[in-house]
Amino acid sequence: MGDRGGAGGTRRRRTGSRPSSHGGGGPAAAEEEVRDAAAGPDMGAAGDAPAPAPSKDADDGVASGHWELRCHRLQDSLFSSDSGFNNYRGILNWCVVMLILSNARLFLENLIKYGILVDPIQVVSLFLKDPYSWPAPCLVIAANVFAVAAFQVEKRLAVGALTEQAGLLLHVANLATILCFPAAVVLLVESITPVGSLLALMVHTILFLKLFSYRDVNLWCRRARAKAASAGKRASSAAAPHTVSYPDNLTYRDLYYFLFAPTLCYELNFPRSPRIRKRFLLRRILEMLFFTQLQVGLIQQWMVPTIQNSMKPFKDMDYSRIIERLLKLAVPNHLIWLIFFYWLFHSCLNAVAELMQFGDREFYRDWWNSESVTYFWQNWNIPVHKWCIRHFYKPMLRRGSSRWMARIGVFLASAFFHEYLVSVPLRMFRLWAFTGMMAQIPLAWFVGRFFQGNYGNAAVWLTLIIGQPIAVLMYVHDYYVLNYEAPVAGA
């Protein structure tokens, strides 16, 4: 390259001294000739040498207006992978514009076809069937009983009033009741609604996970204290003056801080932020209010009509229409899911963390870059992932289980809670959620085996976009048949 560049520069100087046979050259040719003449020495062996000023011969060449004899060089097209070009910002903007226009058309089509269906007052009926009966809020308040019971057991274990075996038995009974009691109320009390049931069961599920962690951490502290006592050591309190040590953590203040903190894993000393940022908190609260209204509006205006129109194809088993309705439902469902993710994991959890000065704000990672199903499940819900690793996966490994069996165990637990939170509020057990979660195991193997890089990322997005509407249609269809067609047939 250096020899060729130098030769080109020499040839231009030689031709520049000849009289022109073509008359005056255009300004573009003259500018190209000056640029190449100046760039010639930079392409030599001393590539870092500064470009010299144009020589007198080059100036003469510009004045005489010679055409450049060479205008091509070795290079790849921009879309070729070898070109090294990666600035596709304009194409990304084009995709965003096309997405906005496409959804605007769908929005106008929906308004023309159905009119305005958004009714904020109707949302109240989703939580309360009878204005004089509030079973869901009562269940949430009753959850305090289980938290106090776990606290009292730990207090007695700390002073030796209970043996570890008796404490374990009481904790198991308490944790089992946390899951069974609200489920029994939901199945037996007619005045509770599916949405109210879902919220109550979610509160009890979160309480179950938190108290499970609370019990484990206090047990580890007792074992560490007993080990230190048997070795003749005494815990040093001067090392960290502002930290809490066991059993000083066993207070109601500490317990309820943990219960309201945006985490499922208990610690004696949580990282704390120095102050409450009022502007940050205000932005998060405004986001919570805005996205709540947006989700309700999209569900009422977009999803509900699509689901209602999907019942007849399911009843007639018209597979082509079922696929068409599935794809039509995929867009609003996925959009609402993305909004829900931002609303919950960024707006809500950050607002709670800011109020409580909770320092660990890693509620999610870059799951949108997932190139495998496993990476997605490890990064989209960090509080649950940390709990599974700390209190389920690693304990199974310590007990001698293989990594493969531990992973299956984690997915089994996740599948159980997914089915618990769907089937019990709907009062029907179809195991679609359980099957969908367990199907993630072979799906993770398949995607990891046959798809890599961008293809793996596309496969993950495809499962998210298509998989969820399938489960939604399955449950809605069965719920519709069970609650609307069956009573009519019986009548």
Swiss-Prot record:
> Where Phosphoserine occurs along the chain?
S20, S21
Catalyzed chemical reaction(s): an acyl-CoA + a 1,2-diacyl-sn-glycerol = a triacyl-sn-glycerol + CoA; all-trans-retinol + an acyl-CoA = an all-trans-retinyl ester + CoA; 2-(9Z-octadecenoyl)-glycerol + (9Z)-octadecenoyl-CoA = 1,2-di-(9Z-octadecenoyl)-sn-glycerol + CoA; 1,2-di-(9Z-octadecenoyl)-sn-glycerol + (9Z)-octadecenoyl-CoA = 1,2,3-tri-(9Z-octadecenoyl)-glycerol + CoA
Q: Which residues form the signal peptide?
A: none
Keyword entries, A-Z:
Acyltransferase, Endoplasmic reticulum, Lipid metabolism, Membrane, Phosphoprotein, Transferase, Transmembrane, Transmembrane helix
Compartment list? Endoplasmic reticulum membrane
Give the site residues for Important for catalytic activity: E419
Instruction: Report the domain remarks.
Output: The disordered N-terminal region is required for the diacylglycerol O-acyltransferase activity and may regulate enzymatic function via its interaction with the MBOAT fold.
**What's this protein's name?**
Diacylglycerol O-acyltransferase 1
Q: What is the lineage of its organism?
A: Eukaryota, Metazoa, Chordata, Craniata, Vertebrata
Q: Which gene encodes it?
A: DGAT1
